[in-house]
Amino acid sequence: ISLAAGVGTAGSTIGGGIKEKNFLGKGINLDTNLEISQDSIKGRFIYSKPNFNYTDNTLFTSIKSTTQDKLSSSGYKITTAGFSIGTQFEQYENLFFSPEIDFTQEDLTTNSSASSSFKKQEGSYSDFYFNYGLIYDTRNNSFKPSKGGAFVFNQELPLISTDNEIKNTIRMSKYKSLNQSKNMIGKASLYFSAVNSLDGSDVRISKRTIIPYNRMRGFEKGKIG
């Protein structure tokens, strides 16, 4: 169980959650989280069951709800709720496949200070996506690796959607022991993500890709530069 609060250059945040790898003693992974900041509320519930029905497959499901209120600063507000269900299994040695079905309902509202492009996107959206990931993992340890590497490719494909965007993400990491006596490990990583509209229209603001905050140094969250 975790509970945290903080104040910084990006504003104040309070949050908490429960993370358990053996929930009820049944090997169930449970991850719940709630985060409240000055302009957003984010909540999620993730349940995963390794070796589901003795098949060596991991079954996972999640429920999420977010509110991003930028009416005072950028003229828009986004409210999102959704759920997903999927599985992950080892297709070949060190190669994992993780298909997922994701449904999201979104409401986008604007005010007079919003840009013309945001005003054009105002409305309600229903998105039904098929997402999948390919993971090639040769790390010697998933928690604190000292050698090997991991390659991850994720793609999000619209099945039924008000807008049609495809998102591709690639993550690569490589680990190498630099000094065994001092337990010094070197890491090199690469992150690439792109969202493209199938009909050439502007990508919806909630679908636009951003660099994850934990991969940036020297920047304020939600700012440019």
Residue positions per predicted region:
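Gram-negative/organellar outer-membrane beta-barrel architecture
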Residues: 1-152, 182, 212-225
